[in-house]
């Protein structure tokens, strides 16, 4: 049964007027860069018509049957979290089906293998009023759930139709500053939400200061930090691939996870230095954006490293390499289990940091640079408990890695302490899914 239409509050209408006034010129200004990224990443033709709110007759027929929840994500990180939430929603409400929408081709590539009877993967529509209305007409969701980012027109269109809408955000210092700067716009949009799932108790005051009503805030814990078993079969497969390259099981492995420009060169140079003391050391680099693989190979060329790309790795054997470049998506979590020490990307040459909890949940010690703003709460607790290592620069990175590679007991202690702190978020996935699914 379709809910009755609802009028938007005047403040929300004013905010949307401003948004739609500036959206076209901003979109056109950003379009060349967006198209360039799409071309580099590939896969942009996949269901491109859905970005304009157009669906095939077969897709519309499928959405016309069953009870659909629209789960809205952006790229790889958000999509992995969305898949986790989707599975929990399905467990809580097995009669529901999920339409998982993504923006990037890499996010689509991660989500698509999970599509099935109850999960349909689609592309996010452009956030223009007529396009999102067309998309809602096709998908016919009973509820809209946003993961880490809100499409204002999509949210408004859902609320006009009387649909509940909930939000699982990430409140980094950068995003908080942006929300505060444009509070005149963001606060009325936030007030359209039926519920917001906050990761930490201290986040509630921050969200209230940004305009979210206290009654709509729920503290659920961080679902990203809630342990999910890695795929043991995939890890075994990856171990066999390393063995086929001549890498013995007891060889120390340094893994750089979700690295950003500049960090690959630092890791490679560090690796060459450490090899003098640890001759069996092997390096794995997983760039955050796999389309940078060719640029990384070019940058590392002067170092004369023997590099093999994951996309070209068949298990048939080749000359013993120095470095494995993970230029595939959706595999990193299962590679972490093979590492001896993990460096967290986007923390040395960029700001914000990438998710440090996945390697910790795999039982691996983590090292990161000075910039972990997006994960400030948990990394601060780790550092206070001597459960992780933070370095200031490349020189200190070399020193700390040398210490850890030489000290198995220290590595085990770090991993155990960090995992114990992360375990405090056990159950966060269920609490988050319940909030996002049932709040009205």
Which residues does each PLM region occupy?
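Structural alpha-helical scaffold elements that stabilize or flank donor/cofactor-binding regions
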Residues: 135-137, 189, 317, 335, ...
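Catalytic binding pocket for nucleotide-activated donors in carbohydrate/polymer assembly enzymes
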Residues: 193, 214, 337-421, 435
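C-terminal alpha-helical cap of glycosyltransferases
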Residues: 425-440
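Conserved sugar-transfer catalytic core signal across GT-A, GT-B, and GT-C glycosyltransferases
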Residues: 154, 263, 331, 354-355, ...
């Amino acid at each position: 049964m379709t809910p009755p239409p609802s009028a938007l509050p005047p403040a929300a209408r004013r905010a949307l007027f401003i948004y739609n006034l500036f959206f076209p010129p901003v979109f056109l200004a950003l379009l060349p860069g967006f198209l360039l990224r799409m071309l580099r990443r590939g896969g942009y033709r996949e269901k491109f018509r859905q970005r304009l709110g157009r669906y095939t007759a077969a897709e519309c027929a499928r959405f016309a049957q069953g009870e659909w929840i629209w789960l809205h994500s952006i790229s790889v990180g958000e999509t992995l979290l969305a898949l986790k939430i989707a599975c929990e929603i399905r467990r809580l409400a097995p009669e529901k089906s999920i339409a998982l929408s993504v923006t990037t081709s890499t996010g689509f590539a991660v989500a698509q293998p999970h599509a099935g009877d109850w999960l349909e993967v689609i592309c996010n529509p452009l956030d223009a009023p007529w396009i999102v209305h067309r998309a809602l007409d096709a998908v016919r969701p009973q509820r809209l759930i946003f993961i880490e980012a809100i499409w204002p027109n999509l949210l408004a269109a859902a609320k006009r139709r009387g649909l509940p809408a909930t939000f699982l955000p990430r409140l980094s210092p950068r995003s908080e500053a942006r929300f505060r700067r444009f509070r005149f716009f963001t606060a009325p949009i936030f007030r359209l939400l039926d519920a917001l799932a906050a990761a930490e108790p201290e986040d509630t005051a921050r969200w209230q200061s940004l305009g979210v009503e206290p009654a709509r805030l729920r503290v659920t814990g961080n679902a990203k930090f809630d342990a999910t078993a890695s795929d043991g079969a995939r890890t075994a497969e990856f171990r066999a691939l390393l063995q086929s390259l001549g890498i013995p099981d007891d060889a120390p492995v340094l893994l750089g996870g979700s690295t950003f420009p500049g960090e690959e060169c630092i890791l490679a140079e560090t690796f060459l230095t450490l090899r003098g003391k640890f001759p069996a050391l092997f390096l794995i680099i997983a760039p955050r954006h796999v389309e940078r693989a060719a640029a990384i190979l070019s940058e590392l060329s002067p170092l004369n490293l023997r590099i093999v790309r994951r996309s070209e790795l068949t298990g048939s054997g080749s000359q013993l390499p120095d470095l494995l470049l993970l230029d595939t998506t959706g595999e990193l979590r299962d590679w972490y289990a093979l590492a001896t020490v993990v460096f967290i990307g986007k923390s040395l040459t960029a700001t914000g940091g990438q998710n440090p909890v996945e390697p910790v949940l795999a039982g691996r010690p983590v090292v990161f640079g000075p910039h972990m703003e997006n994960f400030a709460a948990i990394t601060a607790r780790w550092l206070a408990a001597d459960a992780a290592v933070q370095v200031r620069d490349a020189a200190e990175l070399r020193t700390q890695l040398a210490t850890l590679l030489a000290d198995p007991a220290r590595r085990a202690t770090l991993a155990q302490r960090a995992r114990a702190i992360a375990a405090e978020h056990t159950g966060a996935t269920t609490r988050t899914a319940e909030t996002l699914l049932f709040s009205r």
